[in-house]
Amino acid sequence: MKIENKSDKEEDQMFITFEGIDASGKTSLLAKLKAHVVQKNLQGKCTFTWEPGGRKSPEIQTIRHLILNKESNLSPIAEAFLYSSARRIHLDKVILPNLAKNKVVFCDRFVDSSFAYQAFGRDLGFEKIKLLNELATDKKYPDITFILKISYEESMERRKARQEDEDRLEKEENSFYQKVIKGYDFLASYPEFQKRIFVIDASKNQEEIFESVLKILKDHKTFQTHPIYKDFFS
């Protein structure tokens, strides 16, 4: 498949996403990155958002409730369409406007979650979910994606330690999450995505994970060209 070249305007944009199974450490990592941004006084040049949710858009919150509510009885394909619909709204309302302002957008989950959870976890197939999401997003992909990799057993231990009420997806069984993990492994080796995806050993402590991400960002050729780069690492 031919990969379209970015326009000059898109070359100046930086869209960074974070992926992984539940309790992989994305929330803690993003909190550290946000603190780093505040320390560098770059709040006005960065945006932090998430899926499904995105700055509490009422439309997306309605979809989120449908997807995650334990009382919902959704078919796998209905679930996939709901995620892609929420993603389109999120793009329109949060991601694209902030990228147009040349802000760095840090996002907790994006299309790769649909690939891992719906294409693999729900057995809908990669090509089908890729087609659906490319239609929904106009083939918008992140510039950099970090996949935080942990085992299902480690995920379960962390989730039990949190002692939080689990949503519909978090209640899925081992077999579902093993397929999701295989999905993330597939994405990391998929030729079209290899340049943007970096796998992080999320079994390490939070500081080690944070430092690993900072090093990748510091060495990343595209990030080096962004106006924020010098101040981000000053």
Swiss-Prot record:
Q: Where does ATP bind?
A: G20, I21, D22, A23, S24, G25, K26, T27
Question: Which reaction does this chain catalyze?
Answer: dTMP + ATP = dTDP + ADP
Instruction: List the transmembrane segments.
Output: none
Write down the InterPro entries for this protein, in alphabetical order.
P-loop_NTPase, Thymidylate_kin-like_dom, Thymidylate_kinase
Show the GO MF annotations.
ATP binding; dTMP kinase activity
Q: What EC number(s) has UniProt assigned to this enzyme?
A: 2.7.4.9
Q: What does this protein do?
A: Phosphorylation of dTMP to form dTDP in both de novo and salvage pathways of dTTP synthesis.
- Species, as recorded: Mycoplasmopsis pulmonis (strain UAB CTIP) (Mycoplasma pulmonis)
Keywords carried by this UniProt record = ATP-binding, Kinase, Nucleotide biosynthesis, Nucleotide-binding, Transferase
The record's section on SUPFAM superfamilies has: P-loop containing nucleoside triphosphate hydrolases
Tell me one GO biological process term: dUDP biosynthetic process
| Pfam families in the cross-refs | Thymidylate_kin
The protein's name is: Thymidylate kinase
Q: Which family does it belong to?
A: Belongs to the thymidylate kinase family.
Q: Does the keyword Nucleotidyltransferase apply?
A: no
Q: Where does the source fall among the domains of life? A: Bacteria
Question: Nucleotide-binding: is it a keyword of this entry?
Answer: yes
Listed GO CC annotations? cytosol
